[in-house]
Amino acid sequence: MLQWRRRHCCFAKMTWNAKRSLFRTHLIGVLSLVFLFAMFLFFNHHDWLPGRAGFKENPVTYTFRGFRSTKSETNHSSLRNIWKETVPQTLRPQTATNSNNTDLSPQGVTGLENTLSANGSIYNEKGTGHPNSYHFKYIINEPEKCQEKSPFLILLIAAEPGQIEARRAIRQTWGNESLAPGIQITRIFLLGLSIKLNGYLQRAILEESRQYHDIIQQEYLDTYYNLTIKTLMGMNWVATYCPHIPYVMKTDSDMFVNTEYLINKLLKPDLPPRHNYFTGYLMRGYAPNRNKDSKWYMPPDLYPSERYPVFCSGTGYVFSGDLAEKIFKVSLGIRRLHLEDVYVGICLAKLRIDPVPPPNEFVFNHWRVSYSSCKYSHLITSHQFQPSELIKYWNHLQQNKHNACANAAKEKAGRYRHRKLH
């Protein structure tokens, strides 16, 4: 008994061989647990990376949309090839084609061929009807908007019915149709029906329309889940009533848009209009968000593929007028998804049109950029503005636009002198 106590009661008094033996035993146990855990991950990989199947060579980081590959630029060409695959002709139902003989069937886009038979009840719940049809009637329309003048740029602005103050602020600022001398701009607010079924609000919208003639409205419910319908309404309106428009911008009612910079630095009226042109803040390498609690949740039965094609943030993108008809027509053969910007990207992938990057990555911003007249004189979009803020900063920019960066340089020099003195 005394011998056992001398050998085992205290680790500090153990011999070197005993310590080494005990350490080896513990190490083997830990390595065994690590091996078992690794095998568990191997056989249950889908449970640890939602929305992604199989092993991934690239690390992933979580974003607001879902998972994004940190090496997506490297894999962009291969991803584009995946989205350009087609299925054998014998598997396709009768399909429609546009004037360019582009196949408009969803089977032409990898990832959508299996979604046509998915349950469409989610669309009925959102008041949209069949997920592939477009049958909404105009409540308010402006069919002669482009007959009175030949605009260079149409601003399609997604707005909620109750955002009267936001529409008023936009008319006074970046949506002013007389903003650019010698350049015709047309402003159109895109509205659905208020979910509150407010008769007073609808009468106010009708009066607003009679006064400004810049609202189109159709009979779908105006909700976040119907933003895709709202954008398609705008595309169809442009294709129907302004088919020869050089450029279109789709943006939102809470955005700051430097319209002059957009026209003069990006679109350049002195040059011939581009075709099949689409640009904005490029979103590359994004995978569907499979978190059911997320605003951007994408059910696997609606979109089974592992990754979205390249798309532009819906907060603001610009495209050539010829794409309005092409995007709308191709959408008739592609199952509708509630993520509007992703859906437009899918339509572009089906058309074999790649969004192009803007002149620099700082001109389109889907977040709020801290204000300075210098920064805002060299960007196109900034996000999350209240109507009063929009008017305040717009007026300040207009007052300082000819020397927007001069004050910034003076302030920087002053700070440098202050640091040098202290």
From Swiss-Prot:
GO terms assigned for molecular function: N-acetyl-beta-D-glucosaminide beta-(1,3)-galactosyltransferase activity
Pathway: Protein modification; protein glycosylation
EC category name: transferase
The name this protein goes by in its record: Beta-1,3-galactosyltransferase 2
Region of interest: Disordered: 90-110
Enzyme Commission number(s) of this protein: 2.4.1.86
Transmembrane segments: 25-45
Superkingdom of origin: Eukaryota
Cofactor(s), names only, from the UniProt record: Mn(2+)
Membrane topology: Single-pass type II membrane protein
Tissue distribution of the protein: Detected in heart and brain.
InterPro entries registered for this protein in UniProt: B3GT2_N, Glyco_trans_31
Family named by the database record: Belongs to the glycosyltransferase 31 family.
Species name: Homo sapiens (Human)
Keywords, ordered alphabetically: Glycoprotein, Glycosyltransferase, Golgi apparatus, Lipid metabolism, Manganese, Membrane, Signal-anchor, Transferase, Transmembrane, Transmembrane helix
Reaction it catalyzes: an N-acetyl-beta-D-glucosaminyl derivative + UDP-alpha-D-galactose = a beta-D-galactosyl-(1->3)-N-acetyl-beta-D-glucosaminyl derivative + UDP + H(+); a beta-D-GlcNAc-(1->3)-beta-D-Gal-(1->4)-beta-D-Glc-(1<->1)-Cer(d18:1(4E)) + UDP-alpha-D-galactose = a beta-D-Gal-(1->3)-beta-D-GlcNAc-(1->3)-beta-D-Gal-(1->4)-beta-D-Glc-(1<->1')-Cer(d18:1(4E)) + UDP + H(+); a neolactoside IV(3)-beta-GlcNAc-nLc4Cer(d18:1(4E)) + UDP-alpha-D-galactose = a neolactoside IV(3)-beta-[Gal-beta-(1->3)-GlcNAc]-nLc4Cer(d18:1(4E)) + UDP + H(+)
Methyltransferase keyword on record: no
One cellular-component annotation, GO: Golgi membrane
